[in-house]
């Protein structure tokens, strides 16, 4: 299992580097450190802005999707499209999501990335996402991920958990 996770991480890191090179060529934005990782990607807000504007390819999305707890129905709902549209997009060669959808993909990837770090265990993080939280108005964190403000609340709660603040 650890070998599979390591392979996923290596694939994602490579995909991020390829994607960032494309973003640099298209937008003119230049990175000093070309050896960027998936984790580093979310720390560079200016890079994220340029990446969102370029859009996410379906191939890159597929790699991100493997790292998240969300199924096709969840993703379709988050992206504001039908599951059938998501499947059709998968079949299209060189499909690129619109910037608004790309932003949502990166937001959810960021939450998942932090959640997996905080909980050290994907199953614990996924369980937390689906349990009502007093700190989040007795809503499930998963329910709040549908919009940006909710996502910020979930990230805030994850940071608090990471710091040992359980209020």
Q: Where does each model-flagged region fall?
A:
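Non-transmembrane "mature" sequence context
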Residues: 1-167
């Amino acid at each position: 299992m650890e070998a599979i996770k390591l392979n996923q991480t290596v694939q994602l890191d490579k995909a991020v580097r390829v994607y960032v090179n494309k973003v640099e060529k298209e937008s003119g934005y230049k990175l000093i450190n070309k050896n960027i990782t998936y984790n580093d990607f979310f720390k560079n807000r200016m890079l994220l802005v340029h990446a969102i504007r370029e859009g996410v390819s379906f191939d890159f999305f597929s790699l991100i999707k493997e790292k998240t707890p969300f199924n096709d129905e969840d993703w379709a709902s988050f992206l504001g499209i039908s599951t059938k549209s998501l499947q059709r997009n998968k079949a299209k060669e060189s499909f690129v999501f619109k910037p608004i959808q790309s932003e949502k993909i990166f937001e959810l990837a960021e939450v998942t990335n932090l959640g997996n770090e905080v909980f050290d265990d994907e199953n614990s993080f996924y369980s937390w996402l689906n349990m009502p939280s007093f700190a989040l108005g007795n809503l499930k964190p998963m329910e709040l991920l549908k919009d940006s403000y909710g996502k910020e609340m979930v990230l805030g709660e994850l940071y608090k958990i990471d710091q040992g603040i359980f209020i």
